[in-house]
Amino acid sequence: ERTANKASNQSSAASGKSKKKKRKEITLEDYLPIDKIANGVIYTTDHRYVKILEIEPINFLLRSAREQQGIIFSFISYLKISPVKLQIKMISKKADINKHLEQSRLEMERESDPNCRQLQKDYIQFVRQLSSREAVSRRFFLIFEYEPFNVNRKVEEKEILAALETAAQTAKTFLYQCGNDVLVHDNEDEFTTDVLYTLLNRTKCTETPLPKRINQVLTRYMESGREQEVDNIHINEFIAPESLDFKHSNYVLVNGIYHSYLLVPCDGYKAKVMPGWLSLLINAGEGIDIDFFLHKQPKDKIQQRLGQQIRINRSKIKDASDTNADFDDLDSAIRSGYFLKQGLANNEDFYYMNLLITITAGDLEELQWRIQEMKKLLISQDMDLRSCYFLQEQGFLSSLPLVNLDKKLYELSKRNVLTTGAASCYPFVSYSICDDNGILFGVNKHNNSLVIADIFDSKQYKNSNIAILGTSGSGKTFTMQTMALRMRRKGIQVFIIAPLKGHEFYRAARNVGGTFIQISPASQNCINVMEIRKVDNSVNELLDGPTLDASALASKIQRLHVFFSLLIPDMSHEEKQLLDEALIKTYARKGITHKNESLIDPKHPDHYKAMPILGDVYDVLMETEDTKRLAHILNRLVHGSASSFNQQTNVDLTNKYTVLDISELTGSSDLLTVGMFVALDYVWDKAKENRTEEKAIFVDEVWQLIGASSNRLAAEFVLEIAKIIRAYSGAGIFATQDLNDFFALDDGKYGKGIINNCKTKIILNMEDEEAQRVKTILRLSETEVMNITHFQRGNGLISTNNNNITVEFKASNLEKELITTDRQELLEILKRQDKKVG
């Protein structure tokens, strides 16, 4: 019996072999087998040196069979040169989203709009509820120890540290080939200490993070007048739990949290497994930790023992009848022996592997339920799982990241495997995205982790662009608006260009204090496409000094050529030249030339001169016979049904949430594309003003500008935005539901260009033909394609940083009210509104 309780302000443990013996109390500082942590290495009390690496996992199960095979082969290459003993540890716990919530609270305090503050309050409550129900976080560690080449030779500490660092770099190189990154920490000692503290203080580490715990210990020393001892405080005082209780046969109490240790016995494995089969255990859920041990054996000794055992079994089988039960066992043993012998002859190594499973819970009933569920899970896979009865203390010590599996547990659970078998246990398989400063997308359907991504974090994402692909009714608009609202909640400038069903964006814009600008023949709103806009370059000048004096007129005329090419697709080269001359003449009549000083209004130096409008271009074009055809086509926008385009700009883009609705132009396909370009041109000018301010431009149905109904000039303009918006701290979110048109222009050059310039892709439900097309472009596996064709509304695949995850997109009730288009949900909202009025 061994117990440990907090006493006299110091953690302590009591141990004894019988109840008659007087129990001897020892401090937890002495009990934990850790001497110190220095140079990023754990120095153990039995004079070993242990290194911990944290590994970033990948989404192995969604990779194609060919990719999975490549990963396994890369892992085999690592195992060939890895340390003799390896411990791979996975810990799971409730996701700690406190940093994300704290960031959200700070953003709410900075918000001035009351409606937006309500949205932020609702978001915080929603994320908290979601995380309490289903959010699980997982961390993966690779642990190894220093292995002396010659046990008789005395080795200096610097040689040991150098050897461990070399082993760490080797692991980093080979795991990178698997697709895994080894996380680099600014302070390795702090990282290692935090890992141990987290393991030993499951719930307390959330309430009392390590820095706070350190302060508490230091304060205790200072208050008790022991200032001179502060520099010599043992590391275990900072990381040790307050209490340990080993009195029970099938569980341990650590700080009041129940821990039960189980193992897979020697004969508890399946004979044949799939690559990455450990994901079954790794994704089992909250409170399930996995420790996977590998111990490489000397090949020469194993070959000798194998030969002896095969000969013994062959002599035994001669005396056994083929109807005897022993005959089958001996036959199987001989076959296994020859299999191992053949593998060793083919340059494979021989390992003993062990699986130790830790199950944690807040109370005994929950612990027992989790144990039973875990056993059922393994039985369903033809595997066995046994509790470490009366060996719980050994299980506790073995689960520490010290590469020190207890001998009894080792003998009970060791299973022999060759290198290929060991590599099939590739464990870094459960990828998750959880950025403290990001926005919530939803829940990872494979491992129940929250998907919170900060697309503006340039350290993680090469660019902030997102491509959203999905068929009609797949939830594309819903996903877009959820993202837009959450970006607005963070204070990010949001622009939305809506060419179809613009009314679906109105309710959300109105309820967050946004601006809804409708560009249509019947609307009073107008963006003057001829306007050379005064750009605020103050931030850019502070950063770079005086800007280059490039001609603003030349830049504007270049974009006007795109506008007129959309309006008049069949312009000849001669007409393009004549149009160019007409545009220069139009601006000249307003006193504007290629010199930027000519833009300044002498009466109001802070403003530009009055700009020409399309009617002024029309007048110039009507003056010569060769340009009258162009004038007649332009006439619709000057004197005809679309004359609302023939005004000075009367809209403002300073609002943090701006929707430009051009859906009323859908009656004329050429006008819709023209209107979409005008809106995007105006937004792009605004987005380039301040390179330090985050902004997002949402372009719905982008196929209108880069597809068959557009032309190369307009498509190049959109592609250029996708390429360089990152330089202006911006994100381009491009959505489409018509993949055939999206990839139609120039054999899909511009559609592929947009995809390639979006680090993150969101693929919603698609028809089989569309999914096959995307499969080739995004290099998706058959499993992913099958998922895409069967996705329910609100589910999708997020592809980012070479990982694909299946996500259920989540929205709070308030967000749903603002963006839903579902008829039944709209009726319920209407009923609630009627009750309020009543």
Residue ranges and their predicted role:
Residues 725-742:
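Sensor-1/coupling segment of RecA-like P-loop NTPase cores
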Residues 500, 734-739, 766-767:
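A short beta-strand-to-loop transition that corresponds to the Sensor-1 phosphate-sensing loop
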